[in-house]
A protein has these predicted regions:
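Hydrophobic residues on conserved beta-strands that form the core of alpha/beta folds
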Residues: 23-25, 41, 56
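Short edge beta-strand/loop segments characteristic of extracellular beta-sandwich folds
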Residues: 43-47, 105
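The feature marks short-to-medium sequence segments in extracytoplasmic or secretory-pathway proteins
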Residues: 51-96
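Short, solvent-exposed loop/turn segments enriched in Ser/Thr/Gly
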Residues: 36-43, 117-118
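Short structured motifs
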Residues: 26-31, 85-91, 105-107
Length: 149
């Protein structure tokens, strides 16, 4: 019994040093039909499984052009308790043992179309540590056309 308590104590200490962070749901779809695919919305469900606060400092996606990759920084809409909080810039905090539904709006201001293909690299910076998550987008690829008119 004592060894079990010691193990739990070690887990608690490890949790404080290295927060556990999961992306449990990851979907994407194109929104804003007036812009003809110049805007993309990514919807993710973030879960902080740790016993400490975490701060997400950076979220970006990379288009799949190997020659000229482009990092896109989003506008963030965080939904808590059914209320949307609009936040034009990161970072945002997550309390221990909580989850957030997050909408990320990406707009393409490049001089060319960007192809967001099957494999999407989603890059987080959490508590000054970088986490890169590769996820498959559902069923189809789409283009983010340039936003300038």
């Amino acid at each position: 019994m004592k060894s079990l308590n010691t193990f739990k104590s070690l887990l608690d200490i490890a949790n404080k040093i290295i927060p556990s962070f999961r992306v449990i749901r990851f979907n994407s779809k194109v929104i804003d039909y007036e812009l003809q695919n110049k805007t993309a919305l990514l919807y993710i469900h973030l879960i902080n499984d740790s016993n400490c606060d975490i701060e997400i400092r950076n979220i970006s996606i990379v288009d799949n052009d190997k020659e000229y990759p482009v990092l896109l920084e989003p506008t963030l809409i965080k939904v808590e308790g059914g209320k949307a909080q609009y936040s034009p810039a990161l970072p945002f905090q997550m309390n221990p043992r909580t989850s957030n539904y997050v909408y990320l709006i990406f707009r393409n201001y490049e001089g060319r179309s960007l192809e967001i293909d099957n494999l999407l690299s989603l890059k987080f910076q959490i508590n000054r540590k970088e986490l890169v998550i590769n996820q498959f987008l559902p069923r189809k690829s789409y283009y983010l056309h340039n936003k300038r008119r």
